[in-house]
Amino acid sequence: MHSKDREPVIIQSCRTPIGKFLGALSSLSAPDLGALVVENLIERAGVEPQYLDEVIMGNVVGTGVGQAPARQASVRGGVPESVPALTINKVCGSGLKAVMLAAQAIRAGDANLILAGGMESMSNAPFYIRGMRNGLKFGNANLEDALLSDGLWCAFGHCHMGTHAEYTARKGGVTRRDADEFSLRSHNLAIKALSEGRFAEEIISVSSKNGREKVVVDFDEGPRKDTSMNTLEKLKPAFPEASGKYQDELTITAGNAAGLNDGAAGVIVASRGFARAHGLEIEAKITNYVASGLEPRDLFFAPVKAVNDLMTKEKTQISDYDLVELNEAFAVQALADIRGLKIDIAVSYTHLTLPTIYSV
């Protein structure tokens, strides 16, 4: 096959709405949400599911989800049992890593068609008790939150990830006002984009339960029309325990950081040769990718290193790009990385930033 035929391309993409913590999507597990994405991707793309070489899905808080979450989503989504599935846990980068693995397999000639994405239900993360396997002989037992221990707690720094975000703010020179202004701009852009229907095509409708009632959810629950600078300025710091490390004003609040959410998203990645042979419309091509790592407390600066490494591979510079999408959980991180990469914010965030769509 000609090398151009091995180029990975995206032929279809979709996502569920982003549900608030304990909100409209909380009755569905992560594999349930993933299955809806799998089913809709196959239907939208118009491909026979037996042509899939693999399903790769990211999932972080796997406690209580059940064995092989990606396999659950795949089979429930209508993919034949003969198609293998792989679950990826790279914390926040899990879903994107799934897409990278799909592209790599296709470029290597190991596959022609892969469904890749991510799924999470933070609302359904359980509590558990350590030590009960051997039996508790004396004293109290404490419940631990799997959402915190498996997803939001740094195993190296032994602190909330938000504490590392506070460190990022200081190292990156980002103030509380900077973060609030950035968050407000993001909210306004998101509300505008939603009102103009810019996300309508990518969002699939989800049937869920609200108590005994069945509801259909087709909108993101995060963005708030009533957000104002006055409201954001009144919010208390989200990680007061960080005050022991940082004596000046704390920066992270519920208004300038991502919330806890439920949702799933995915793409179908094909080789260009397969797409052409089957008459499939191409949405985008995947030209390159880079993964990067830093010291744990510096993790929020990793995108700067990754993007610089990517541009070195591509022999480009940041000014060559007309649009940059930087998906980060904290406004302070987004700002620190924007400054670190010298990105023109006017061409970077046309609709929203991620803290908005996932906001509380």
PLM regions and their residue ranges:
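N-terminal extracellular/periplasmic Venus flytrap/periplasmic-binding protein-like
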Residues: 14-16, 27-36, 44, 178-272, ...
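Single conserved hydrophobic/aromatic residue that forms the stacking wall/gate
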Residues: 351-360
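Flexible glycine-/small-residue-enriched beta->alpha junction loops
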Residues: 113-167
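Glycine- and Gly-Pro-enriched alpha-helical subdomains that act as flexible
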Residues: 272-320
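Active-site-proximal alpha-helical scaffold in enzymes
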Residues: 88-120, 163, 169-198, 266-273, ...
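Active-site nucleophile and cofactor-binding loops and adjacent substrate-binding regions
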Residues: 66, 85-94, 260, 325-327, ...
